[in-house]
């Protein structure tokens, strides 16, 4: 009888110890899963933050456009607009077109073409300006800006069509100089308009007058 009692006590102790071990293992497994989940969540958040940063556009490519109202086109690279409630003259940044209205100067070849084309462009849609990092006005008080119609660069169009040359390049107002030079080279290679006459375009401007 005594042996039977001892055996029963031993069985009960074995069952109790087994149950405790099982609970301890389950707790460890649960803790392990919790730690793993936190680790995965942290990694996921870091990935998302990196992905968002990587997807943020570079500030250089961002345009801060200002809406203006056209008053009139003056020539190929100059217009008058209503800006901040007042009339202002805008001189196009980084380009030069043949003269048509410069005092004491003749009308130059393709000057009228550039003037006409510019007038068509600025009258064709929503007019906006973009300023660069440097001075917003030249020594004559004119606004210096990149000009857009319905989001498209007027300067680029004039350059691509051979009606303007890249000029007056002064840091830091050079945001689009690389693109403008590519546009100019494209027209030059195709010998469009101002590039169709050898020696007409120089580093100082244009040679010759309309006879």
Swiss-Prot record:
Start and end residues of each stretch annotated as Disordered: 24-63
Describe what happens without this gene: Non-essential, it can be disrupted. Cells lacking this gene show DNase activity when exposed to thermal stress, as well as increased competence.
Instruction: Indicate which residues the UniProt annotation says bind Ca(2+).
Output: 77, 96-97
- Activity control mechanisms: Inhibited by aurintricalboxylic acid but not by Zn(2+).
The protein's GO terms of the molecular function aspect are:
endonuclease activity; metal ion binding; nucleic acid binding
Q: A Pfam family this protein belongs to?
A: SNase
Chief place of localization: membrane
Reply yes or no: does the keyword Manganese apply: no
| Residue positions of covalent lipid attachment, annotated as N-palmitoyl cysteine | 20
What cellular-component terms does GO give this entry? plasma membrane
Q: How is the cofactor bound?
A: Binds 1 Ca(2+) ion per subunit.
Q: Which cysteines are joined by disulfide bonds?
A: none
Keyword entries, A-Z? Calcium, Cell membrane, Endonuclease, Hydrolase, Lipoprotein, Membrane, Metal-binding, Nuclease, Palmitate, Signal
Residue ranges, compositional bias (Polar residues): 31-53
Q: Where in the cell is it found?
A: Cell membrane
**Summary of the function given for this chain in its UniProt record:** Shows DNase activity on double strand DNA.
Into which family does the record put it?
Belongs to the thermonuclease family.
Q: Tell me the protein's name.
A: Endonuclease YncB
């Amino acid at each position: 009888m005594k042996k039977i009692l001892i055996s029963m006590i031993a069985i009960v102790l074995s069952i109790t110890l087994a149950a405790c071990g099982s609970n301890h293992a389950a707790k460890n497994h649960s803790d392990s899963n919790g730690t793993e989940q936190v680790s995965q969540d942290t990694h996921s958040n870091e990935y998302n933050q990196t992905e968002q940063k990587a997807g943020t556009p570079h500030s250089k490519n961002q345009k801060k456009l200002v809406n203006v109202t056209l008053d009139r086109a003056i020539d190929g690279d100059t217009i008058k607009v209503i800006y901040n409630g007042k009339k202002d003259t805008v001189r196009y940044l980084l380009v030069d077109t043949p003269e048509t209205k410069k005092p004491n100067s003749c009308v130059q070849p393709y000057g009228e073409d550039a003037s006409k084309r510019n007038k068509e462009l600025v009258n064709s849609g929503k007019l906006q300006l973009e300023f660069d990092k440097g001075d917003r006005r030249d020594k004559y008080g004119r606004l210096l800006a990149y000009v857009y119609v319905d989001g498209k660069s007027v300067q680029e169009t004039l350059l691509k069509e051979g009606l303007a040359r890249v000029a007056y390049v002064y840091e830091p107002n050079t945001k689009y100089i690389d693109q403008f030079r590519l546009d100019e080279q494209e027209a030059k290679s195709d010998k469009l308009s101002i590039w169709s006459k050898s020696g007409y375009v120089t580093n100082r401007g244009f040679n010759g007058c309309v006879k």
